[in-house]
Every structure is written in structure tokens, then in C-alpha cells.
Amino acid sequence: MSRSIKKPPFCAPHVLRLVNKAIAQNKLNSIINIHSRSSVILNKFIGLTFGVYNGKTYVPVKVNDNMIGRKFGEFSPTRRYTGHVGDKKVSRK
């Protein structure tokens, strides 16, 4: 079920505080590290770079206009795909 239209998009208050501070200090090129993967990307985030925590490291995410309305967690994968292991019988030949 999707979020009600009556409600505004969710964005953690501390993320908004960090963004407002970066804009006020004119630090638009610095990385803003956040843990809130469930926060929605808003219009005022365009052009900023966020470090989204994936459980181990901060993955840099540069926000552009195509990302508005999506969540930060979509751009920071938490699992690494290592591929399938090949069949040992085939490799012996």
C-alpha cells in the first residue's frame, strides 16, 4: 500500500538540518553523511552529494532531478553479489 496523498513526503529532521546548514555555509561540494536510508529525496537536495550508509561504508550519492521522490536507500546497495560458483566437474576437463 502506498503512502497517503494527504501526508507530506518523509524526510528525517536531522537530514533537513544538515542540508540547511550546508546551504547556509555554502558547502555545496562537501559530502553530507547520513544514515537515514528511508528519507525521500526532495527538490532542495538537487546538486548536493550525500554519503548514504550501507551498513559498512558511506556510498556517495550525487542528487540530480531524476532522483526526486525516491529514497536514499535505493542508491546505496547493502548486499554484494559475488556470482554463482561454477561446476567443479566441468573445470577438470
From Swiss-Prot:
Keywords: Ribonucleoprotein, Ribosomal protein, RNA-binding, rRNA-binding. PROSITE patterns: RIBOSOMAL_S19. GO terms for molecular function: rRNA binding; structural constituent of ribosome. InterPro entries: Ribosomal_uS19, Ribosomal_uS19_bac-type, Ribosomal_uS19_CS, Ribosomal_uS19_SF. It holds the Pfam family Ribosomal_S19. The keyword Ribosomal protein applies. One of its GO terms (cellular component) is small ribosomal subunit. The keyword Secreted does not apply. GO terms for biological process: ribosomal small subunit assembly; translation. It comes from the Bacteria. PANTHER family: RIBOSOMAL PROTEIN S19P FAMILY MEMBER, SMALL RIBOSOMAL SUBUNIT PROTEIN US19M. Belongs to the universal ribosomal protein uS19 family. Protein S19 forms a complex with S13 that binds strongly to the 16S ribosomal RNA. This is Small ribosomal subunit protein uS19.
